[in-house]
Amino acid sequence: MSYQSHEYYLRRAIEISREARAAGNTPFGALLVNKDGDIVMEQGNIEITDKICTGHAEATLAARASHEFTKDFLWDCTLYTTAEPCAMCAGAIYWANIGRVVYGMTERRLLELTGSNEQNPTFDLPCREVFPGDKRQLRWWDLFRKWKQMQPKFMKAIGTSRRTLYGYVF
């Protein structure tokens, strides 16, 4: 798949994160793309509005997808997300059998932006360290280098600035 295709899906994930933020949640979004390039599922963060501590976009999408699709189908899919999946979400992606993950911002960069805020507690255990134990060889792509160049556009797209991302002052 071309970089332009990855960028297209990441831009849609940004739109989903804007929708999540507008609904009162933190701005995270994820979507699932099948092997033909069709978006088959979208999910924003629901942690705050639904009062579900595991309501991250990626974990919720993985749970929904595993209920709706077969493991074989999901192995050929790609999950796109605005930020690198946390350890919990990486586990959900693994158990759902989603074959690929593409994210725009590393977990460590997210931690730099949010600081140690109780709404974004992190294990500092990126999916890049969780997935290598997977014997099925799930694949992931870090588009962070290019994403860094797009970050001001990302902040503008979700309606905030770097200083007020997630409503926190840095």
Model-derived regions: residue spans:
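Glycine/small-residue-rich phosphate/adenosyl-binding loop
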Residues: 41, 58-67
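Short beta-strand scaffold segments in enzyme catalytic cores
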Residues: 28-34
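Immediate flanking context of iron-sulfur cluster ligation sites
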Residues: 71-83
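Local cysteine-cluster metal-coordination motifs and their immediate loop/turn environment
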Residues: 82-100
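Zinc-dependent deaminase
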Residues: 1-20, 94-170
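A short, polar/charged loop-to-alpha-helix boundary motif
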Residues: 49-59
